[in-house]
Amino acid sequence: MEFSQKLYQAAKPIINDIYEDDFIQKMLSGDIGADALRHYLKADAAYLKEFTNLYALLIPKMNSMNDVKFLVEQIEFMVEGEVLAHDILAQIVGESYEEIIKTKVWPPSGDHYIKHMYFQAHSRENAIYTIAAMAPCPYIYAELAKRSQSDHKLNREKDTAKWFDFYSTEMDDIINVFEALMNKLAESMSDKELEQVKQVFLESCIHERRFFNMAMTLEQWEFGGKVND
């Protein structure tokens, strides 16, 4: 079994939990609230900006010009292509995507996720650690979306179905490239090192779950110490 497949197998329980959590279930039924969608879009805009920067940090770690070319293309996709998925949700809210994200949010779950990825990029020379931190994002979105296509709970009368349709196909290219890169880099690594990479991958899966849940709870920083009049 290739290394990437071992990672996917290990991540299955987490992905199952994400699918059963409120965000995806409400998206399937089309009953998700506008406040949750706004919070998700605002937080995701901040997340994707940093995710794009991480592609740029990966480029110097690449040995192949083909890999560099693909990463540059992915930066373009993050800036332009994925906006289509965001527009679907913005239309459900009834506001333009640009208007929604004018108000920035940086919730704890997004903060911790982004810092997890940056730590791998800055502290590990081997690109596999950064890739393992980034790869769960497109993989989980694709897995959730593909599973939805055969789920009777997917309400085709609601526009949220278009969001699932988008992610059921649009992540395939980056998933395939991340797989190939991880499998190639894993060949020269020890079992102990691969276990560390697996840990990085699974931690990102947990961060993905927390990110979706963040939207449902309208998560924000809580510093306590309320002042009583």
From Swiss-Prot:
Gene Ontology molecular-function annotations: thiaminase activity
The top EC class, named as a word, is hydrolase
Example GO biological process? thiamine diphosphate biosynthetic process
**Pfam families attached here?**
TENA_THI-4 (PF03070)
Q: Which gene encodes it?
A: tenA
Function, please?
A: Catalyzes an amino-pyrimidine hydrolysis reaction at the C5' of the pyrimidine moiety of thiamine compounds, a reaction that is part of a thiamine salvage pathway. Thus, catalyzes the conversion of 4-amino-5-aminomethyl-2-methylpyrimidine to 4-amino-5-hydroxymethyl-2-methylpyrimidine (HMP). Is also able to catalyze the hydrolytic cleavage of thiamine; however, this thiaminase activity may not be physiologically relevant. Therefore, is probably involved in the regeneration of the thiamine pyrimidine from thiamine degraded products present in the environment, rather than in thiamine degradation.
Task: Cite the binding residues for substrate.
Answer: D44, Y141, Y167
The record places the site described as Increases nucleophilicity of active site Cys at Y47
Fetch the PANTHER family from UniProt.
BIFUNCTIONAL TH2 PROTEIN, SI:CH1073-67J19.1-RELATED
Q: Would the keyword Hydrolase be found if you checked this record's keyword annotation?
A: yes
A single cellular component GO annotation? cytosol
Listed under catalytic activity are: 4-amino-5-aminomethyl-2-methylpyrimidine + H2O = 4-amino-5-hydroxymethyl-2-methylpyrimidine + NH4(+); thiamine + H2O = 5-(2-hydroxyethyl)-4-methylthiazole + 4-amino-5-hydroxymethyl-2-methylpyrimidine + H(+)
Q: Which InterPro entries match?
A: Haem_Oase-like_multi-hlx (IPR016084), Thiaminase-2/PQQC (IPR004305), Thiaminase_II (IPR027574), Thiamine_Salvage_TenA (IPR050967)
What's the Enzyme Commission number for this chain? Answer: 3.5.99.2
Organism of origin:
Staphylococcus aureus (strain USA300)
User: Quaternary structure?
Assistant: Homotetramer.
| Alphabetical keyword list | Hydrolase, Thiamine biosynthesis
- Protein name as catalogued: Aminopyrimidine aminohydrolase
Q: Which family does it belong to?
A: Belongs to the TenA family.
Is Hydrolase a UniProt keyword of this protein? yes
* Residue positions of the active site: C137, E208
Pathway(s) it belongs to: Cofactor biosynthesis; thiamine diphosphate biosynthesis
